[in-house]
Each structure stands twice: as structure tokens, then as C-alpha cells.
Amino acid sequence: LDLGRLYNEQRFAKGVTMAEVSQSCQRMLDDLLAGRDATLLDNPHYRLNIVVVKSHGLLADDHRGRLGLGLSSVIADNLRGRARLSRHFERLIIHDPRQAPPLHPLKDFPSRSLDLELGNLRQALLASGSIPMVMQGVRDLPGAGAGTYRDGGLLDYHLDLPYHGDDIVLYPHFTDRVIPGWFDKGLPWRRSNPQGLQDVLLLAPSREYLARLPYGKLPDRSDFKRFVGDDARRNQYWQTAMSESQRL
């Protein structure tokens, strides 16, 4: 609830820069954690896992022109085959050292893991939301080495991962479709691996539930543009949706 409130309170003027959005998100993270960082690492019930990608080539640059060229190359390669994204990204799973995530060895893309600790927690959280052209990448993530780290959803948009074990994986989601990567959103033929999801229980909003929300959808990042200059109306819409989700 605190995160929802803080995110709802964000204000972005037309023409906001990547640096300004990153600074705003850093302040939001500071307000959210408020010196309680350690509680995320010693929670007795939950183990935090954060997925980011290390960006290669032009994707390591936050200059709009060079970054735009890099993204164009990613889009073209992704159309030829998802495996070609290994030229552009390396997957990094930053996890609670008390328990590694329950995954089979990751062989689809270059991947590695890193222990989550106080020294890299905030940078990892910030990197996990660093969408290219929206926010700056996070430089030189502590423990991960030099480089530019961005939102792990670029590779693993909906966590189409090879889970192992006999337990059921509960996946609260915002849609009833599992889309492998960010660049697959407009590719209806790019589907998740059914074998990897055979023990996944997907919990998603029904069409009837969405129809009852203002504008017939969940709030999303595009609302900042939709309601630019009218944050009061966006706040009201988002608060209504959050209240409905809390009731649900």
C-alpha cells in the first residue's frame, strides 16, 4: 500500500528527462524503505529475488540517439528469434542468500546470480525498474561488475522460467497471458513454454473485474501521458483501482 501511494503521488511534466525520472524514483525508494532496508533481507517468511539485465553495446548508453539505435537492433533481432537477444543482454538474478530461487539451470541466455545484500539492495531495486528511454540505467551495480544494468523484464517480461520442484508456483499476475520478453508484447505467436509452466497457478483479473474499473483497465505507466497536466484525475482513477484491488 505504501508503494502504491508513493507511486500515485509521482508527478511528471511533459518532456520529463530520463535523469529526472530516475531521480524521482530514487526519492520514492528512499521514502519507501525509510532506513528499513534490512527488513527486506531478514524477513522470516519471504525471500526477495530481483531480476535485472546487463546491457551490451549501444544499450549500455543513455544517450537517446545511441540507445534508440540499440533498441532498434534488439527489435530486429527479436523478430528473427528470441535467442538472438543474447547478443544484447545478460540475465542477472540477485537473490536472498538464504535460499536460491527454485529454478533449473538457465541455458536460454547468458545468466548468473548474485547474493542480495545491503550494499546492492537499493541499486538492484532501481535497476529492476529502469526501462530504456524512460529511466537511466544503473551503473556498476555493486558485486555485479562494471556495466549498465536495466529492467530484467526486457528479457523476462512475465517470468517464463524453468521452475523445479514438486510445489505449485503461485503467480499473481495482471493478465492471463505469459509473454516471455518485453519485445514480444506485439508478437502473438511468441508464446511461453508450456512445460515450464505446468506447475504454475496463474491468478489474473477477470474481464468482468477489469470492466468495472475506470477506463476498463488496470492503471499503468501510460497513464502519466494520458493524464499529463491533470494529476488529480489520474490520482482519483488509480486510487479507485487500488481500492478495488484491495477489496478483491
Question: What are the roles of these predicted feature ranges?
Answer:
Residues D2-L248:
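Patatin-like phospholipase
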